[in-house]
From Swiss-Prot:
Region Disordered: start-end pairs: 65-110
Signal peptide: none
Skewed-composition ranges (Gly residues): 92-107
Family under the similarity heading: Belongs to the UPF0229 family.
InterPro entries in UniProt: UPF0229, vWFA_dom_sf
Cited Pfam families: DUF444
Designated name of the protein: UPF0229 protein Psyr_4632
């Protein structure tokens, strides 16, 4: 019986190639369905697939056929109704028109084609064409950094990196291969010598010949070296370059008393979407979480999203803390610095000009991109207008948007992080 071993990487998903071709072909339909699903779901409910439906008419293959239009000259058999040269009226139907009618007991049609996309495919369509703007390579004038990683086994190398187990295994295999036939002959000769000593003890000549042959075979086996340079195996270490583009995202969230529970929920959903986007699209990125009311604190992910602490409103406290963290841990010469700020716009009146001054002088010259999201259905307040002045001075690296309801989160997010063409 013969066996077929399938060593393909997608052996259990043999139609993966066809599926990818299908997803590319109907990308517009799927992307539209994903956007509708995002607006329908909770932002915290993004990490699973979606049922996609495509109208049947959109998956039909185009075909060429004869139409029903035009004039045709055809000879039909005569009968008592028609005579030679008369024209026959075109039969009714077949024109593909639509009109009012009643239900019938016959006929057929085609439902929409539905299929399920996976979590990975859903997130791919969800974050398609999004990126962190102005991500550049830092330390262009410095030396690249490398890390040493294992890369298998080599026949050459430094003696300090010798792999003892693989070396002894190779030596053992070589000795078996080179002395295998001699050992087989030795076993046969030894067995024959024992038989002759037992059954023919007087046959001294043959016994002596066998003893000489046995000594010769043992000497041949001993001449096979225990360890040869061919057997030496070394651990292969290679230098792998570290990514030169290092990025950090500062997440600043207002948790003051003016933020209602609904407003805080929208802010958290926005940052959850941002966090999901960063962790999925970028392997090497730091995220710094800052919550603020009258004072600001750097917190971990759990406290950022779930703490109930609240208080008054002084937005500049968060900006000052961000600037201190930048100076201490993230020098702009080495890091691509990003920031996303969410607030309802309420702020102590004298503090809004301070915020603009801190941003203009201490933060914006050193960041790649800064986004401000104001969550309010009301008219904008002083903070928004101060930030508008910043946007005029830093048009390429500063953006601000307004959120009114949870349904605005995804469209605004795409607007802020839409991939930009590089001129």
């Amino acid at each position: 019986m013969s066996y077929v071993i399938d060593r393909r990487l997608n052996g259990k998903n043999k139609s993966t190639v066809n599926r990818q071709r299908f997803l590319r072909r109907y990308r517009d339909h799927i992307k539209k369905a994903v956007e509708e699903a995002v607006s329908r779901r909770s932002i915290t409910d993004m990490e699973h697939g979606e049922q996609i439906s495509i109208p049947g008419r959109d998956i039909d293959e185009p075909v060429l056929h004869h139409g029903r239009g035009g004039k045709q000259t055809v000879v039909h058999p005569g009968n008592k109704e028609f005579t030679t040269g008369e024209h026959i009226a075109r039969p009714q139907g077949g024109g593909g028109g639509k009109g009012p009618g009643k239900a019938g007991n016959s006929g057929e049609g085609m439902d929409e084609f539905s299929f399920q996309i996976t979590q990975e495919e859903f997130l791919e369509f969800m974050f398609e064409d999004l990126e962190l703007p102005n991500l550049v390579k830092r330390n262009l004038t410095g030396t690249d950094t490398f890390k040493t990683v294992r890369a298998g086994i080599s026949n050459e190398g430094n003696p300090s990196r010798i792999n003892i187990i693989r070396t002894l295994r190779s030596a053992h295999a070589r000795r078996i291969a080179l002395s295998g036939s001699s050992r087989a002959k030795l076993r046969e000769a030894t067995a024959e010598l024992e038989r002759m000593k037992r059954e023919e003890p007087d046959n001294f000549g043959d016994i002596q010949e066998l003893e000489v042959e046995i000594d010769r075979l043992k000497a041949r086996i001993r001449r096979v070296p225990y360890l040869d340079t061919f057997d030496l195996k070394y651990n292969l270490l290679v230098k792998q370059p570290n990514p030169s583009s290092k990025a950090v995202m500062f997440c600043l969230m207002d948790v003051s008393g003016s933020m209602t529970q609904a407003t805080k929920d929208i802010a958290k959903r926005f940052f959850i979407l941002l966090y999901l986007f960063l962790k999925r699209n970028y392997d090497k990125i730091d995220v710094v979480f800052i919550r603020h009311h009258t004072s600001a604190r750097e917190v971990d992910e759990e406290e950022f999203f779930y703490s109930r602490e609240t208080g008054g409103t002084i937005v500049s406290s968060a900006l000052k803390l961000m600037q201190e963290i930048m100076a201490a841990r993230y020098p702009s010469s080495d890091w691509n610095i990003y920031a996303a700020q969410a607030s309802d716009g309420d702020n102590w009146n004298d503090d809004s000009p301070i915020c603009r001054e801190i941003l203009t002088k201490q933060i914006m010259p050193f960041v790649q991109y800064y986004t401000y999201v104001e969550i309010t259905p009301r008219e904008h307040q002083a903070l928004w207008y101060e930030y508008e002045r910043i946007g005029e001075d830093f048009a390429d690296t500063f953006a601000q948007q307004q959120l009114v309801s949870a349904g605005d989160i995804y469209p605004v997010f795409r607007e802020l992080f839409q991939r930009r063409l590089v001129s």
